[in-house]
From Swiss-Prot:
Modification comment: One or more lysine residues are methylated.
Protein name: Large ribosomal subunit protein uL11
Family in the record: Belongs to the universal ribosomal protein uL11 family.
Lineage: Bacteria, Bacillati, Bacillota, Clostridia, Eubacteriales
Subunit structure and binding partners: Part of the ribosomal stalk of the 50S ribosomal subunit. Interacts with L10 and the large rRNA to form the base of the stalk. L10 forms an elongated spine to which L12 dimers bind in a sequential fashion forming a multimeric L10(L12)X complex.
Amino acid sequence: MAKKVTGMIKLQLQAGKATPAPPVGPALGQHGVNIMGFCKEFNAKTANQAGYIIPVVITVYQDRSFSFILKTPPAAVLIKKEIGLESGSGVPNKTKVGKLTQDQLKKIAETKMPDLNAASLESAMRMIAGTARSMGVTIEE
């Protein structure tokens, strides 16, 4: 018989830098999960993605065990990394902060593809382009 699920926790953590401090500790503590066990496992699995923010979905079972699924980094984080930005524009319709080429856009879309509900690479590229525009990044044709 399958284990009974008692909770789902969604967090966005720095790759390889999960610690028992907030937000990890309180989120897992209220479900009775071994916090250090999660931190060690998460850090081991994300060590090669240093510098990225990794969304993680933690499933907590009745016997206080857990499993987790790593997602791809948010599109905004990938865009900022690709063009070397610190942050997006405060007023994206007026202030432009960078340019993204079609090749860079395609690379980001391919990275995000498993987590997007897009049927094709072209539609994934349009989704990423929309995110870029809302950050004040222009897309070169």
